């Protein structure tokens, strides 16, 4: 694939990064959550998967050599987790899906962190996870990052946007590529990396993202909705502009929560993720052997 573009993506204004170039916005929303229940799952709308692009590292980033081909991923050891599955909608439009099964189902397999560079290209979104035995306290919420090549990631960690080695970031032991979970049209990979690098070094008081997922997703999709205070004041939106998080409970049972902003939906989704335990359906010894 190299650095040759497979296609040229024409972006409209709604897909470009907005707001202050420093990423600083002062507005902040505080809204309540309304819950209701449904027995039927809605079908997810069909969206094409984004093409990949070769990129060059922008100024300020550590040089990013090309990652090994991802075509050999079938040779890598996969783990399957028993974890909470979600989908999210704005009105009737599906904007996020972490649901397995079906032709549009997400691949929820995870890999040892040491195997991820073979699956990644610069501009990819990664979700990093900590696996713990069931008796242990719940693990932290999944951590999101932008892969910039050469085994390096840029992420929001402990109140700072920083560049770290993928192998050392937060001591996570497994991860996966999650480019397709959000259904927005992505920016070209070079711009994704540029967005991430352009905010390196920002501290808590300068950051307008409330968690690692919102920052990484903003880098890839450039939508101001991922920023704190990036949407209209609560209570002024019609139902078709409100957000709905569906927690899939199995046996066609769905728990649905309504939100006035994407920021609050992501916060609740991550709270549920952090309160659950990731239980490996295969022996943890397999993971240890794979890392060795």
Swiss-Prot record:
Domain called LRAT: residue spans: 133-228
InterPro entries, A to Z: LRAT_dom (IPR007053), LRATD1_LRATD2 (IPR043299)
Tissue expression notes: Only detected in testis. Highly expressed in colon cancer cells.
One Pfam family from the record: LRAT
Keywords: Cytoplasm, Phosphoprotein
Location in or out of the cell: Cytoplasm
Main subcellular location: cytoplasm
PTM-bearing positions, type Phosphoserine: 38
GO biological process, one term: cell morphogenesis
Superkingdom: Eukaryota
One of the record's GO cellular component terms: cytoplasm
Family: Belongs to the LRATD family.
Entry function: May play a role in cell morphology and motility.
Name by which UniProt lists this protein: Protein LRATD1
Annotated organism of origin: Homo sapiens (Human)
